Regions:
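Extended surface/linker regions that mediate inter-domain or inter-protein docking
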Residues: 86-154
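Sequence context surrounding c-type heme c attachment/ligation sites in exported
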Residues: 22-70, 127, 131-154
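Bacterial N-terminal signal peptides
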Residues: 7-18
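Short beta-strand-initiation
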Residues: 8-9, 69, 76-78, 113-115, ...
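Short secondary-structure capping/turn segments at boundaries of alpha-helices and beta-strands
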Residues: 26-27, 70, 79-81, 105, ...
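Positively charged n-region of N-terminal signal peptides that target proteins for export
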Residues: 1-7
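Short Fe-S-cluster ligation motifs
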Residues: 64-86
Length: 154
């Protein structure tokens, strides 16, 4: 009987409201930058800096963009994609979801070698890479050209 009473009282205690309430502050995470990491992880940082992982995703700048954006175009199954610059900004003009030509500002590069893609921001907050990418290999190896990631698909 004493075991039953103990279990009964323990069950009742579990049903009582907690005496203390804890509040958890919801703070949004933000990117602090790689240099902050270097302060505590100098060896790992020196191995990472300049590697393909370092270059994996960069803001679209003259230093990071490898593709030819000098008013060139690429056509795949009748769909034309144009690459150009306006000042310091990089643009890709291609068909939008409605099938109409639209210019999209490139926000980021994605990848480095042997290919580089370009990320386009959309109004809903997504970043989208297009089906056309830049082959960053040397020309002698068949690179330095635009190509479609899915060559057999329209």
């Amino acid at each position: 009987m004493t075991v039953f009473l103990r279990l009964f009282f323990i069950s009742l205690i579990c049903l009582l409201p907690a005496a203390h309430s804890f509040s958890v502050e919801n703070t949004a995470a933000s990117f602090v930058g790689a240099d902050v990491c270097a302060g505590c992880h100098a060896d790992q940082y020196s191995l990472w800096k300049g590697s393909h992982h370092d270059w994996a995703m960069q803001a679209a700048t003259q230093q990071s963009v490898l593709g030819d954006f000098n008013q060139v175009s690429f056509e795949h199954y009748g769909e034309r994609t144009e690459f150009y610059r306006q000042g310091q900004d990089y643009y890709i003009k291609t068909q939008n979801a409605e099938g109409k030509m639209q210019a999209f500002k490139v926000a980021y590069t994605f990848g480095f070698y042997p290919l580089q893609q370009y990320l386009i921001p959309f109004p809903d907050g997504r970043m989208q890479a297009l089906g056309v990418a830049w082959d960053s290999r040397p020309k002698a190896e068949g690179g330095q050209r635009w190509f479609h990631l899915y060559p057999d698909e329209a």
